[in-house]
Curated annotation (Swiss-Prot):
UniProt pathway: Cofactor biosynthesis; coenzyme A biosynthesis; CoA from (R)-pantothenate: step 1/5
Principal location class: cytoplasm
The organism of origin for this protein: Pectobacterium atrosepticum (strain SCRI 1043 / ATCC BAA-672)
Residues binding ATP, per UniProt: 95-102
Designated name of the protein: Pantothenate kinase
Biological process (GO), any one: coenzyme A biosynthetic process
Length: 316
């Protein structure tokens, strides 16, 4: 099969790093180095080059899509003869634990809010829609946290449905990685943002991923543009272990941390525990529930060592 035939056989356009970077097209970098440091995750080296070469072209593409969506809404309003209500544009970000979804979400939030239109951009993680630990313990699901059955999918779907229905005020529960649980009485209130970035393991999942809980509507039905942050497991596992070691030195040392006991481990013991957690929980969830959703994404960002994106695939 020729390269042209192979290109026609895939639903994606593929770009290497330099090809993708060229699509920035003179868009100015509106973030300072100090701001970028605040946006990066505990386990990542986020550079100015990464933002300029990967995220600026992506923010430019998203700006085109968002403007196109606004024009489509205007056409519908003209046809109906109505003043339509404000409908947020939803960007979904999926991928494995430790791949850097949260950093991607924060960088895009910062960049999209700095476009000349000065749009309001909210960021919500689906962690807030996990069942509380009390419920997970009752259902013997603590070791399945992050798996489809650990989420209150009905509440999550209602949340995105209300957002897309133009509801003026919508609330979302919040999750604490310190206590490893939902924070009671601490809902975040969203008031019709222009853009909602929804980040989580499960934003691309559909009916086939929830055979235990049949319902007809899914988060992915409401997402306008979806991004899958990808990396080979040979990188993901060491990233996860390294992140665990950094938490051991930092967050785990807090007496209020759910994982406070891990702070007392030797490095060798910590690596052993993290490797076991990856094998039994996060790696398993990746293979069974997250990776199978990758090809549903509008765009796939593939990372290499040091969390640098080396390839971008964009759905035609």
């Amino acid at each position: 099969m020729s390269n042209r035939d192979q290109s026609l056989a895939t639903p994606y356009l593929q770009f290497n790093r330099s090809q993708w970077a060229a699509l920035r097209d003179s868009v100015p970098l509106t973030l300072t180095e100090e701001e970028i440091v605040k946006l990066k995750g505990i386990n990542e080296d986020l550079s100015l080059d990464e933002v300029a070469e990967i995220y600026l072209p992506l923010s430019r593409l998203l700006n085109f899509y968002i403007n196109s969506n606004l024009r489509r809404q205007a056409v519908l309003e003209q046809f109906l003869g109505t003043d339509g209500q404000k409908i947020p544009y939803i960007i979904g970000i999926a991928g494995s634990v430790a791949v850097g979804k949260s950093t991607t979400a924060r960088v895009l939030q910062a960049l999209l809010s700095r476009w000349p239109e000065h749009r309001s951009v909210e960021l919500i993680t689906t962690d807030g829609f996990l069942h509380p630990n009390k419920v997970l313990k009752e259902r013997d699901l603590m070791k399945k946290k992050g798996f489809p059955q650990s989420y209150d999918m009905h509440s999550l779907v209602k949340f995105v449905s209300d957002i897309k229905s133009g509801t003026h005020q919508v609330t979302a529960p919040t999750y604490s990685h310190l206590t490893y649980d939902i924070v009671p009485n601490n809902n975040k209130v969203l008031e019709q943002p222009d853009i909602l970035i929804l980040e989580g393991l499960n934003v691309l999942q559909s009916g086939m991923d929830y055979p235990h809980d049949p319902h007809r509507v899914f988060v992915s039905d409401f997402v306008d543009f979806s991004i899958y942050v990808d990396a080979p497991e040979t990188l993901l596992q060491p990233w996860y272990i390294n992140r665990f070691l950094k938490f051991r030195q930092g967050a785990f040392s807090n007496p209020n941390s759910y994982f406070h006991n891990y702070a007392k481990l030797t490095e060798e013991e910590a690596v052993g525990i993290a490797s076991q957690l990856w094998k039994e929980i996060n790696g398993l969830n990746l293979k069974e529930n997250i990776l199978p959703t990758r090809e549903r994404a509008s765009l796939i960002m593939t990372k290499s060592a040091n969390h640098a994106v080396e390839c971008v695939r964009l759905r035609k």
